[in-house]
UniProtKB/Swiss-Prot annotation:
Taxonomy of the source species: Eukaryota, Metazoa, Ecdysozoa, Arthropoda, Crustacea
Ranges annotated as spanning the membrane: 17-37, 48-70, 74-94, 98-118, 130-150, 157-177, 191-213, 226-246, 263-283, 285-305, 322-342, 353-373, 404-424, 429-449, 455-475, 518-538
GO BP terms in the entry: ATP synthesis coupled electron transport; electron transport coupled proton transport
Gene this chain is encoded by: ND5
Protein name per Swiss-Prot or TrEMBL: NADH-ubiquinone oxidoreductase chain 5
Annotated family: Belongs to the complex I subunit 5 family.
Length: 541
């Protein structure tokens, strides 16, 4: 599809980073040290927009949570943890120096760990452990990069083009862990053990988008030449997650894998130097993905199951929710003139024009898979027969529908509004015959394919949905380092290191203090005798 968009900032994406810059800095000059410790907050247009978007999604999810979590024992604790999670994301968005970045980055990891483990069962505990360990890798890489930035005498990463390649590589790898790019993708589907409001917030504009946001901030360093690592890993992540979503039967995990696929698209566009298009897709995706998770929560709450093989007849029980799910699925496919269409099509067309054959083919196949699993959700959940006759009651009440309809208009109109904002109001869309045929073919084949491939065999389904046994591979890879760490802890910190270090010093200190106390509190005869012996000792030796 040939799209002509008169975007004044398309070829100069740095303008996006320099509009409305209002620096507010406090320099704490350390005496006799050449290093200036700077705490700064820089307000620019892109940061302000994503902050408003995160605030909009967070407010609607909090309203949704107050009704969805009604009846839970520790609902107040849950709400406070959600507020901490949102505050960490706000701190990350508003930061422009390494220290505040680290506080927000680490706060997201800790609060997400607590929220995933909200339900007290083995699945939640194991999922929380996978999440925190994966995010710890990114935290270590961030700390490492901050240590290297110390030698540049500033932690302000507003202009990172002056930094070395090693610092950029550390930031890229840390963003891979937070945004669940290969090979750190295992934790994202596992995080679906959390309550549905947490999933809605995590996958729309907070945790998983933190890595993308960091790469957008660092994009001036590589947007001219591109980054082939981001291109390849983004395309592979999008392809494997789309294939896994096609073989998955858990409704929430399918939506989570669709998020992972779109994160791969964003990384792919960043690697090509299409920073504005990546930001556009992040904006559009956040609008309909939060809505899609909230609708899935209504369906799961009404039917009492998450397995889409046991769902059906939802359109007759939940007509409004079914309609919103259909609109969100079409937007996820990139159906013309919905929010997902504008950004995704720009990325695909630009990737074709840049003549990168293998990643572009993978991205086209990923778009086909996106249409396939989105159609499968609609076919199984909305159109098929309901086999769960004991749970036919509706949860479509005013309290649930209010946040859904607020975000619905964003999912329908948000992409076009964003396009008007960054094009100056001059937008013309011309559909060429060849590329419009390619777009319609991808959507049509994706819609028809689930009717022919209605089910996988058990072994094939497990193989595909696990992203080619990625959790097993990454788990076995981390087994030996964790085992060595446990052995070093028990044999070292709790063994001979403890006995030869702190314990020995403690015992010797106790003995010395006891002897000193005995000498100072003894009768005068003992004190005089000890003084005499000490004098004789000093005289002869």
């Amino acid at each position: 599809m040939c799209i002509s968009l008169h975007l004044t900032v398309y070829r100069s994406n740095k303008c996006l980073l320099l509009i409305f810059i209002i620096p507010i800095s406090w320099n704490l000059l350390i005496k006799n040290i050449l290093f200036a410790f700077g705490l700064s907050s820089v307000l620019w247009l892109a940061k302000t927009i994503i902050h408003l978007l995160s605030s909009l999604n967070s407010s609607q999810v909090m309203i949704y949570s107050s009704y969805y979590m009604m009846g839970e024992t520790f609902v107040n604790r849950f709400m406070y943890m959600m507020l901490g999670f949102i505050s960490s994301m706000v701190l990350l968005i508003m930061s422009s120096d390494g220290l505040s970045l680290m506080l927000g980055w680490d706060g997201l990891g800790i609060t997400s760990y607590l929220l995933i483990m909200f339900y007290k069962n083995y699945n939640s505990s194991s999922s929380g452990m996978i999440t925190i360990l994966s995010n710890r890798v990114g935290d270590v890489l961030i700390l490492w990069s901050l240590g290297l930035m110390f030698y540049s005498k500033s932690w302000d990463y507003m202009f990172l083009s002056y930094f070395s390649l090693s610092i950029m590589l550390l930031f890229i790898l840390s963003s891979f862990t937070k945004s669940a790019q290969l090979p750190f993708s295992a934790w994202l589907p596992a995080a679906m053990a959390a309550p549905t409001p947490v999933s809605s917030l995590v996958h729309s504009s907070t945790l998983v988008t933190a890595g993308i946001y960091l790469m957008i901030r660092l994009s001036p360093s590589f947007e001219e030449s591109g980054c082939f690592l981001l291109v390849v890993m983004g395309a592979l992540t999008s392809f494997f997650s789309g294939l896994a979503a096609f073989g998955e039967n858990d409704l929430k995990r399918v939506i989570a894998l669709s998020t992972l696929s779109q994160l791969g698209v964003m990384m792919f566009s960043l690697g090509l130097g299409l920073t504005l298009f990546c930001y556009f897709h992040l904006f559009a995706h956040a609008l309909f993905k939060a809505l899609l998770f909230m609708c899935s929560g209504v369906v799961i709450h009404s039917l009492g199951v998450q397995d889409n093989r046991r769902m059906g007849g939802v359109s007759s029980m939940l007509p409004y929710t079914s309609y919103i799910i259909l609109v969100c699925s079409l937007s996820l496919m990139g159906f013309p003139y919905l929010s997902g269409f504008f950004s995704k099509d720009l990325i695909i067309e630009s990737s074709e024009s840049l003549c990168m054959l293998f990643p572009s083919v993978l991205m086209l196949v990923s778009c086909l898979l996106t249409s396939t699993y989105s159609s499968r959700i609609a076919m199984v959940c909305l159109c098929s027969y309901n086999y769960n006759l004991s749970c036919q009651y509706s949860d479509e009440e005013g309290e649930y529908l209010t946040p859904l309809f607020v975000l619905y208009w964003g999912a329908v109109m948000g992409g076009y509004i964003f396009l008007l904002m960054f094009s100056g109001g001059d937008v013309s869309i011309i559909l060429g015959p060849l590329k419009s045929f390619l777009l319609l073919s991808l959507i049509t084949v994706g819609v028809i394919l689930p009717y022919f491939v209605k089910s996988f065999s058990l072994s094939l389904s497990h193989y595909v949905s696990s992203m080619m046994f990625l959790p097993f591979i990454t788990g076995r890879t981390s087994f030996m380092p964790l085992l060595m760490g446990e052995l070093l802890y028990h044999e070292g910190d709790c063994g001979w290191v403890e006995e030869a270090g702190p314990s020995l010093i403690h015992h010797n200190s106790l003995r010395g203090s006891s002897l000193f106390s005995f000498l100072t509190s003894s009768p005068y005869k003992v004190l005089i005798l000890s003084s005499l012996l000490f004098t004789l000792f000093m005289y002869f030796y």
